[in-house]
Amino acid sequence: MRINVLAALALGCLALAGCSTGKSTDLGFAAAAQDGTPFTVSQVAGEHAERAYFFCPYTDKAQAEALGFNPDDVYSINDNSQRWETWSGIGVIFSDDRTPAIEWFDPSIIDACPGATTGDPVDVHAPITPTVQPVEFAGDEGPTDVIKLVVE
């Protein structure tokens, strides 16, 4: 059953062009979450992942900039209010020459913020466990299985 749910989520993500958005960088977190096994930021983003942060709905561009990210990589009420209100992500600062990047997640597929708020640091070596939970969305006929990312 769990494999079927994860396979369906993976296909849904592929249908959304790999869960990519104009502001999102594919760092590999969506694929790692859909695999269903615990992972760390450093395993996914590489050994040069120095710091990581959660980005939750209603992230403020100035808040992201204060953490070291490009404010243009963050949704706002002015450029995409629906994503600003609903999408979550994980942002990574690298110790090498790579640009800081945020991978954003469609809320019907992955929720990076159960119990977290924007700017909460993520230990790059701490296990993140993807757990599938049913979520009720307005207008849907029934619950949707969403992958929740839980830091241990």
Which residues does each PLM region occupy?
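C-terminal partner/receptor-binding element of secreted or periplasmic proteins
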Residues: D111-E152
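Bacterial N-terminal signal peptides that target proteins for export
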Residues: M1-A7
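Secreted/processed peptides and extracellular or luminal domains of membrane proteins
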Residues: T25, A62, G119-D120
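Mature extracytoplasmic domains of secretory-pathway proteins
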Residues: A45-C113
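Bacterial signal peptide processing site
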Residues: S20-K23
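C-terminal motif of bacterial Sec signal peptides marking the signal peptidase cleavage site
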Residues: A15-G18
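Post-signal peptide N-terminal segment of mature Sec-exported envelope proteins
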Residues: L27-A45
